[in-house]
Amino acid sequence: MTKSVIKTVEWSDEGVVLVDQTKLPTEEVYVTCGTYEEVAVAIKDMIVRGAPAIGVTAAMGIALGVRDAKASTLSELRQMFGMICRTMGETRPTAVNLFWAIRRMQRKFEELSNMPLAVIKAEMVFEAKRIHLEDIAANQAMGRNGAVLMPSEGGVLTHCNAGALATAGYGTALGVIRAAVESGKNIRVFADETRPFLQGARLTAWELMKDGIDTTVISDNMAGAMMAQGKIQAVVVGADRIAANGDVANKIGTYTVAVLAKEHGIPFYVAAPWSTIDLDTPDGSKIPIEQRNGREVTHIAGKQMTPDNVRIENPAFDVTPSKYVTAIITERGVAKAPYDESLRKLAETETVSA
């Protein structure tokens, strides 16, 4: 496979290294977060974004905080560890991968509680690195599982950015597209611009073009027309949280695309790692939806586009009911309706399908 060389998040002795996604596509800038507080700010300010990437980054931020903690006893380290985890948990509420990563690091800390402090610190760093590698492997498995579902030829629409930039590498929805192209399929990607943060226009187009994949950017309100004209044969998106019944929380505008796809008889696929599946949340109505600063809507590239004092709504995500979802692609396999049964069955399978 030709793998993307984009390094979204990396561990270094100096801290957690992130590509600043707020600067793309015109500038490729890397920032080093030297403290766990700086990592938390980077997540909140969307220097790093995408549910899997947020989870990996949070794990590394926790490891960084533990490594550098000025604690002389286990009790002191545990107290600091709790504060670090709380700080990470307050960054972004919708992406369940964030809380999955925090819980995993918490379990690891408790497993190590009888070890010397130096060992605890080293092992916590190792656990974060393991999460990073596991995410890449999961994305590649997702790509294999989803590539067979893509058309042998034609247009594939994607919304937001669910690629290497949203993960530790390779991508979820874009991983499926990458794997399909690498298998010889002749795919043309249509990337919704994805207002208001423009992840499709800025990020998806940037990374697909780096890989030489045929890509066309369209504005969000063009999707229906493209479908009606027969230019779209499939839709594949990522997810920030998937409920037990298959309802999908993803970037705002995903619900609209799903309804349009259903109307035009076009399959709508969701690609996400198992850490995005939240079997403890029964349906989409229970998923918290992050509300972001209205300035993201009122301003584009620093220029105000709306009248002063107009009211603004800026939910970062919407929920697509499972009835619009053709299949959910994970590293463990592909789930189809009824999702409450198929997702439970996948929960019992191996972590990564062969």
From Swiss-Prot:
Classify the source by domain of life.
Bacteria
Per UniProt, the keywords (alphabetical) are:
Amino-acid biosynthesis, Isomerase, Methionine biosynthesis
Name the active site residues. D240
Chain residues that bind substrate: R49, G50, A51, R92, Q199, N250, K251
Q: Entry's SUPFAM superfamilies?
A: NagB/RpiA/CoA transferase-like
First-level EC class: isomerase
Q: Pathway of this protein? A: Amino-acid biosynthesis; L-methionine biosynthesis via salvage pathway; L-methionine from S-methyl-5-thio-alpha-D-ribose 1-phosphate: step 1/6
**A UniProt-annotated Pfam family:** IF-2B
Q: Which GO terms are recorded in the biological process aspect for this UniProt protein?
A: L-methionine salvage from methylthioadenosine
Q: Which InterPro entries match?
A: IF-2B-related, IF-M1Pi, IF_2B-like_C, Initiation_fac_2B_a/b/d, M1Pi_N, NagB/RpiA_transferase-like
Site-annotated residues for Transition state stabilizer: C160
Q: Name one GO molecular function term.
A: S-methyl-5-thioribose-1-phosphate isomerase activity
Reactions accelerated catalytically: 5-(methylsulfanyl)-alpha-D-ribose 1-phosphate = 5-(methylsulfanyl)-D-ribulose 1-phosphate
Family according to the record: Belongs to the eIF-2B alpha/beta/delta subunits family. MtnA subfamily.
According to its UniProt entry, the function of this protein is described as: Catalyzes the interconversion of methylthioribose-1-phosphate (MTR-1-P) into methylthioribulose-1-phosphate (MTRu-1-P).
Q: Which HAMAP family match?
A: Salvage_MtnA
This protein is called what? Methylthioribose-1-phosphate isomerase
Instruction: Tell me which species this is from.
Output: Koribacter versatilis (strain Ellin345)
Name the gene: mtnA
